[in-house]
């Protein structure tokens, strides 16, 4: 595992297609955030999971970002297509692979399928 802290950002305002605006806590993004926090706790993982009000990728809900100091940041979407509990496990799997890299670039063949299909952007490390 990486000694550098990894952060997962989850867009909690993301809505699945046809989903109501209110209540906000029932939106797909909020459900994924809760499922990810729960799955990380159940797995004994000490991960920083941050709820973000909007990541401006509304056409590909739910959007998630993985980042760590000195590493590439990845933005993934399309997690509203699967149950939040399944998406959370996929994200934790991808996160473990991300943490094992020096630069944040998970080799293509090692990425969970949802991280291959769902990649939106890769941003270079800062600094």
Task: State the predicted function of each range.
Residues 7-21, 51-68:
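Local cysteine-cluster metal-coordination motifs and their immediate loop/turn environment
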Residues 20-29:
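Glycine- and acidic-residue-enriched helix-capping/strand-helix junction motifs
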Residues 30-47, 68, 79-89:
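Ferredoxin-type iron-sulfur electron-transfer modules in oxidoreductases and energy-metabolism complexes
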Residues 59-60, 65-71, 92-127:
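Short flanking/linker segments adjacent to small metal-binding domains or redox-active Cys/His motifs
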Residues 76:
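Canonical phosphoinositide-binding patch of PH/PH-like domains
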């Amino acid at each position: 595992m990486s000694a550098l802290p990894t952060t997962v950002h989850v867009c909690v305002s993301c809505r699945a297609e046809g989903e109501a605006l209110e209540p906000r806590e029932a939106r797909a993004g909020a459900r994924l955030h809760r499922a990810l926090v729960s799955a990380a706790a159940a797995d004994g993982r000490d991960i920083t999971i941050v709820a973000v009000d909007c990541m401006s990728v509304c056409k590909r809900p739910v959007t998630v970002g993985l980042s760590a100091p000195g590493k590439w940041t990845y933005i993934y979407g399309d997690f509203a297509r699967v149950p939040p509990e399944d998406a959370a496990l996929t994200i934790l799997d991808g996160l473990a692979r991300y943490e094992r890299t020096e630069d944040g670039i998970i080799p293509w063949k090692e990425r969970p399928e949802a991280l291959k299909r769902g990649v939106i952007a890769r941003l270079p490390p800062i600094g």
